[in-house]
Amino acid sequence: MKMTVDFEECLKDSPRFRAALEEVEGDVAELELKLDKLVKLCIAMIDTGKAFCAANKQFMNGIRDLAQYSSNDAVVETSLTKFSDSLQEMINFHTILFDQTQRSIKAQLQNFVKEDLRKFKDAKKQFEKVSEEKENALVKNAQVQRNKQHEVEEAANILTATRKCFRHIALDYVLQINVLQSKRRSEILKSMLSFMYAHLAFFHQGYDLFSELGPYMKDLGAQLDRLVVDAAKEKREMEQKHSTIQQKDFSSDDSKLEYNVDAANGIVMEGYLFKRASNAFKTWNRRWFSIQNNQLVYQKKFKDSPTVVVEDLRLCTVKHCEDIERRFCFEVVSPTKSCMLQADSEKLRQAWIKAVQTSIATAYREKGDESEKLDKKSSPSTGSLDSGSESKEKLLKGESALQRVQCIPGNTSCCDCGLADPRWASINLGITLCIECSGIHRSLGVHFSKVRSLTLDTWEPELLKLMCELGNDVINRVYEAKLEKMGVKKPQPGQRQEKEAYIRAKYVERKFVDKYSTLLSPSEQEKRIISKSCEDQRLSHTRVSVHTPVKSNDSGIQQCSDDGRESLPSTVSANSLYEPEGERQESSVFLDSKHLNPGLQLYRASYEKNLPKMAEALAHGADVNWANSDENQATPLIQAVLGGSLVTCEFLLQNGANVNQRDVQGRGPLHHATVLGHTGQVCLFLKRGANQHATDEEGKDPLSIAVEAANADIVTLLRLARMNEEMRESEGLYGQPGDETYQDIFRDFSQMASNNPEKLNRFQQDSQKF
């Protein structure tokens, strides 16, 4: 070890020694400053490194999130995952490097400064103190006078002791200086060497890590080159396709008009339509509609679950809507609700209507057998009230309706194609149909044919009676009168196109109806009328039914002796309440109905309760709301009321009769039914939406007439209907369709009117007593 300060000079305490000490002390002070600065920089570097590792970890988490996002791309996901794992290892290596830096630089140099330099400073303080004491002893010894021997000896002893202490401390101080100068070299070099070895280990680990990752990176680079080439190729193809599409004419937007019944994904057609909401504001909202799985559904967003508009297309129909201000509208009607839709153009509207009709037909063909296995689901007839969960005693349903309707002659086979065991019916025509023909009937629209299922739908008693009054034989005698004469053959089962053409010609164009050769003018009709005053008989005597009832079954439907046709028991009229004496009109009995105007024929047949004649009149184009100017503008529906037939009224209503059309006296069907005390008809008209607030020329509404006549049953019905109407108005559009008590009472009256009408004849019987 090379001595920085000489021990001999220390003993001499020469100026050279003092100069050497001054130089060493200055050097040590500067060394302390440098080491303190280096330690602070090391601490800052370590803190910054830790922050770098923390930020790097967040960056790695971002890469992992991106890898999870790219889970559908195996190459990207695998690459990002592998790279993030490798970089995470590098973060771990950085953490180790910073830990080793803290131990090698910060800890070692701080220990050197705190331990060795502190000892040097302590030794320096002792040396400076003893040096000062030595100087004081020398000065005191020099100042002692000769004649003071005692003081001389004392000063000499102090000086000797002080010199001895000085030499001892000075030698220790010099030793500390020399040791410090030697140790600082080793400590600094040792720290830096440890720091460099830490870096060596860091880069060696990184090299090993990336050596393993190198082949994968090389393969990925090759894949990337191929991806770049493929991307350039796809870009050229897309640019070419883009250029081709730009050259097309999109003015008609024919691409949206396509529909495919046999689509692999089950979607027949899809696209945007406007849907009218059922809220109070009737707002229109644009939604994505699709026809799939025999259902019409829509959704606002793709992630939303589709909302089902029509659960079973077989139970609905579609028609144009021209009576609203918005263009291109059409309506999908099911037994329980309707949905108003709007397309963007006329072509799109036609395409959607055709798609719905085609889907309905396809559903009939493919699911004919399955439909019979479906759960019995209630779907009230057109115009009737929502009846909720009815008991079997109050509504006829399923096999019961099927058996009763098929008992009518001709109803055991399809009316149009002859297929056996038909399970569908057209309620306004009174015929039975196979499932395929019923689909074609639905496509005609409800103004031509209203289709119901004999096994799936719920049948109210008056509707079932109507079906039993007509039948396939009766209707075919009218609509196929000229079939053999024209040489036309009925289509066979399975020939759908032939069926569709035949059914349209039969019911829409009415090509096979035997038109009347000549129709007399009104003046000629008057000449051939045999008039007699029979109004008194009509208003004061009980009118007997056309058919004589001979048997009653469990449903309350009475069979007739002549042809098995069903009819209602007769009802009597209340002559005291109807018209003042002397104001009764003369009724007309005609010689031959074929010479009558179809409207007049319907008018006459409605009073006579002759449903076959009524069907014939409608087939010849009779207006169901025809008004007889010779009899106070009375309508066929009013005549049906006067005739006392509930089934006749039901038939006219099913064929579009206006329940609120009034005669010149201001009396509608509800007025006349109330005057005559026909409780069943009052119940029927109220269910069909008759206006009970309308007043006649005398200012009387049906309720005041019933109260005046003291007809408790009709008063009950009218007041209950009025109360229910007020409840619905107070609840607004979002209220329930009717109170359960109201529905139950009306069902009871409907059952009683159809099955036990004699129970409702109390008013007539009481009036006859007087």
Curated annotation (Swiss-Prot):
Chain positions found as Phosphoserine: 384, 387, 521, 573, 576, 767
Task: Look up the domain of life of the source.
Answer: Eukaryota
- Give residue ranges for domain PH: 266-361
Alphabetically, the GO molecular function entries are: GTPase activator activity; phosphatidylinositol-3,5-bisphosphate binding; small GTPase binding; zinc ion binding
Kindly indicate whether the keyword Transport belongs to this entry.
Answer: no
The record's subcellular locations are: Endosome membrane; Cell membrane
Arf-GAP domain: residues covered? 399-520
Name the residues that span the membrane: none
Arranged from A to Z, the UniProt key words for this protein are:
ANK repeat, Cell membrane, Coiled coil, Endosome, GTPase activation, Membrane, Metal-binding, Phosphoprotein, Repeat, Zinc, Zinc-finger
Keyword field contains Amino-acid biosynthesis: no
Subunit relationships: Interacts with RAB35 (GTP-bound form); the interaction is direct and probably recruits ACAP2 to membranes. Interacts with MICALL1; the interaction is indirect through RAB35.
- Protein's UniProt name: Arf-GAP with coiled-coil, ANK repeat and PH domain-containing protein 2
